[in-house]
Amino acid sequence: MILSSKASFIHQRIRKNTVFAAFCAIFAAIYEHFSHQVYSPYMICAFLFPVCLGIVPDIIRLKLCKSPKYLQKAGQIYSRHDISHIYEISLVMQQCGIYTFAVGSIFRGILDIYGTTNVLSAVYWWAGAFLFIGGIGINCVRR
């Protein structure tokens, strides 16, 4: 039962990341169209954060979920209820890191298009790295 809810949780994350990646790509296209064809690599590549850090690893997780060896190991790991909550918290932290990376990339792209800089844009990269790596760390410590 917990494994099926885990798979549905991952399916939900894939849908959210797909919608967010599409939003980032459409936002970048519209923003650059109205900025008189001035481009920024940060703006163009913002959609890659949810794709590379969210969708691809989640598809791999789903493929691993279906293997018999993983199901046996997961049955032992998820036999206690509190561990599954820790797993969900780690995935939510990773998701927040992905969103922070993408928003920071869009913000940096906006600054590049306007031809200005801001020291505070580095906060997005540090916060995104902290959240994403922290989520992975919680997941590794749990095992």
What role is predicted for each listed range?
Residues D112-T117:
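Membrane-interface helix termini and inter-helical loops of multi-pass transporters
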Residues Q12-F34, P41-P68, S90-L111, V123-R142:
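Hydrophobic cores of alpha-helical transmembrane segments in multi-pass integral membrane proteins
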Residues S5-Q12, V38, Y78-V92, V119:
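Juxtamembrane loop-transmembrane helix junctions in multi-pass integral membrane proteins
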